[in-house]
Amino acid sequence: MQKIVQVQKISRRFADGTVALDGVSFDIFQGDFLLIAGSNGSGKSVLMSLIARLDEPTSGKIVVQKSFEAGLVFQDADSQILGETPWEDVMFSVKNLRLPKSEAQERAAAALEKTGLLEKKDMSARTMSGGEKRRLAVSGILSMERELLIFDEPFANLDWPGVRQVVSIMKELKAQGKTLVVLTHEIEKVMALASRFIVLDKGRLCFDGSPKDGLRLPLENYGIKNPLNSYKGLEDLLWN
């Protein structure tokens, strides 16, 4: 598999002395569904901002293949919605690419159709449910044809229908061969979809391996609920 992101011994220290990340190294491969777990304060969101080049590491470096620039779905989807309607919002994303109007409209329509929002393209974006807003955020990324998608705590503040909507999108993106990085402490929702599992704790990488092996860890020690306390195995975590 093609190596598309190389995270090489990165550390991030802030002016007040806080160490958010400490010597973290791993690679992301094309087609990965990488689940990164950790409790609040483990460094997940800081790591996301570094991979997406919204911030710079204090030391170490991150190498991203040019054709695999990241598209982000933030924990607060409202912060990504700039248009009054889903159509306006996705068109705003596409216009940044300076495409001909007809091509921009085709991309916007295709992205909204993939996320099941085309029929709602003219509704008020502000009145959408949490799950719909996450889908709209994904639509904007898809319209820009990003191959690497990063989800930061995608299930935060979602009701169960919203969770199912977001998981459904992830399953479809995985089937399309997209590379997904999901940062969450709610691992039971996507553990069965993941191809790799990373655990962060207090800014350090504690585990990088298969989800099956990850479930054998004392996850509670890292502030992560082990789904095997409620389910028998990964097969019980599959979404139908």
Tell where the protein language model's regions lie, with residue ranges.
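Helix-to-loop junction immediately C-terminal to a conserved catalytic motif
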Residues: 52
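Conserved ABC ATPase "signature" region
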Residues: 102-120
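Conserved ABC ATPase signature
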Residues: 124-128
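Catalytic Walker B motif of ABC-type/P-loop ATPase nucleotide-binding domains
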Residues: 149-152
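H-loop/switch region of ABC-family ATPase nucleotide-binding domains
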Residues: 184-185
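A short, surface-exposed alpha-helical micro-motif characterized by mixed small hydrophobic
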Residues: 190-192
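Conserved beta-strand-loop-alpha-helix hinge in the C-terminal portion
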Residues: 204-225
